[in-house]
C-alpha cells in the first residue's frame, strides 16, 4: 500500500497525531479480511490530512447518505435480534469502529460537569432512537417514528438561539411552526393533517412516538451543550461505550429475545454499525476541513432521504400526505437555518 509510507510518519485519529513505528509488522500480522479493514481505517486517516476543502465537503456529504440508512437498518436488525439485543449489538460494533478510527477518548480534556450532562443527553438520545425504532409495530410506523426524530435540527437551532446567544431573524418562528405542522401531517396518516388521525395513530404506540420526540430533544440538548462549552476533540467513542453497556445490561436483566447469529442477522448488524460509525468518521472530516454551511444544509434533507431508503429496504408504504409532511419538516428546518445565518445566500 502506498499509504503505508505515510503511516510511518503520522496516523491521525482526528484529535492528535499518533506515531507508529512498525506499520509493516502490524499489517503483516493481519489476515486478508482484517487487512482490508485496516486499509479502510488507514485511508480515512490519510484522507483527513491530504484533501482540499471541496474534497472534504464531498466526503462529509457521505455521512448524509450513510445516516439515511440507519433507521431502516435498525428496524431490520431488531426483527432478527430483538429491539434491545439488536441495538446492543449495533452500538457495540459501532464503539469498536469509532475507537479504531478516532482512537481512545481523552476524557481529561473535558470538565466533569460537561461529561456528566453530555453523557446523559447523548446516551438518552441513542437509547431513545434505537428502542423507539426497534419497538415500532410495522414498517410505516418505523418511518413515522424516524420522522419525529428528525425534528432535532429545528430544536438544535432553537437551542442555539435561546441558550447560546445565536442571533436570529423573527421569522425563525415560521420554520418552527412549519416543522411541527409537517410532523402533524405525517402522524395524521393517510388523512393528512387531522387531529383525530393523529390521536388514532399515536395511541397505537404512544411510548414509541414519545421516545422519538425525546430523542430529538436529547440530541438538540447535546449539540447545544457541546457548542456552548466549545468542547474540543471527540468523546463520541466514550458515549457509545456507555450506550452499549446500558443496552447489554437491559438485555441480560430483562431480555426475552435470543440473539440470532445467522448470516443475515450479522450482515444487518455490521451494516448498521458501519453506517453509524463511518458516518461519524466522514462527518468529522467534513466539518473539520470542509464547508460547514453546505454540510448543514444537506443534513436537513436526511428525513426525505431516510424515508426513500426505508420505502425500499423495509417496504414501508408511504402516502402522498406523508411526503407532504416530510417536505414541510425539511422546509421548516431550512427556514430556521436561514433565519440564523449572518450573511445572505
Stretches with model-predicted labels:
Residues 68, 119, 123, 127, ...:
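Hydrophobic/small/kink-forming positions within alpha-helical transmembrane segments
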Residues 55-63, 102-131, 206-215, 251, ...:
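Loop-to-transmembrane-helix transition segments
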Amino acid at each position: 500500500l502506498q499509504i503505508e509510507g505515510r503511516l510511518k510518519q503520522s496516523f491521525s485519529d482526528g484529535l492528535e497525531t499518533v506515531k507508529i513505528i512498525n506499520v509493516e509488522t502490524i499489517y503483516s500480522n493481519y489476515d486478508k479480511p482484517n487487512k482490508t479493514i485496516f486499509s479502510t481505517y488507514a485511508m480515512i486517516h490519510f484522507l483527513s490530512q491530504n484533501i482540499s476543502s471541496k474534497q472534504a465537503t464531498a466526503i462529509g456529504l457521505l455521512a448524509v447518505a450513510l445516516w439515511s440508512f440507519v433507521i431502516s437498518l435498525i428496524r431490520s436488525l431488531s426483527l432478527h435480534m430483538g429491539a434491545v439485543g439488536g441495538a446492543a449489538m449495533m452500538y457495540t460494533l459501532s464503539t469498536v469502529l469509532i475507537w479504531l478510527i478516532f482512537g481512545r477518548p481523552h476524557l481529561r480534556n473535558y470538565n466533569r460537569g460537561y461529561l456528566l450532562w453530555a453523557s446523559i443527553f447523548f446516551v438518552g438520545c441513542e437509547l431513545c432512537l434505537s428502542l423507539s425504532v426497534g419497538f415500532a409495530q410495522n414498517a410505516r410506523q418505523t418511518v413515522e417514528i424516524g420522522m419525529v426524530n428528525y425534528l432535532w435540527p429545528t430544536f438544535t437551532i432553537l437551542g442555539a438561539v435561546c441558550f447560546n446567544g445565536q442571533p436570529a431573524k423573527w421569522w425563525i418562528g415560521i420554520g418552527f411552526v412549519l416543522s411541527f405542522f409537517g410532523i402533524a401531517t405525517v402522524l395524521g396518516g393517510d388523512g393528512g393533517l387531522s387531529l383525530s388521525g393523529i390521536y388514532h395513530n399515536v395511541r397505537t404506540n404512544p411510548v414509541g412516538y414519545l421516545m422519538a420526540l425525546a430523542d430529538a430533544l436529547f440530541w438538540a440538548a447535546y449539540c447545544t451543550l457541546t457548542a456552548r462549552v466549545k468542547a474540543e476533540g471527540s468523546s463520541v467513542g466514550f458515549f457509545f461505550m456507555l450506550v452499549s453497556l446500558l443496552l447489554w445490561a437491559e438485555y441480560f436483566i430483562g431480555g426475552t429475545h435470543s440473539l440470532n447469529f445467522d448470516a443475515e442477522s450479522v450482515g444487518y448488524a455490521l451494516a448498521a454499525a458501519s453506517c453509524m460509525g463511518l458516518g461519524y468518521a466522514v462527518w468529522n472530516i467534513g466539518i473539520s476541513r470542509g464547508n460547514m454551511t453546505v454540510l448543514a444544509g444537506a443534513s436537513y434533507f436526511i428525513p426525505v432521504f431516510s424515508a426513500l431508503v426505508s420505502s425500499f429496504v423495509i417496504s414501508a408504504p408511504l402516502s402522498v400526505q406523508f411526503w407532504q409532511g416530510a417536505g414541510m419538516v425539511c422546509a421548516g428546518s431550512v427556514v430556521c437555518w436561514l433565519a440564523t445565518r449572518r450573511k445572505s445566500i
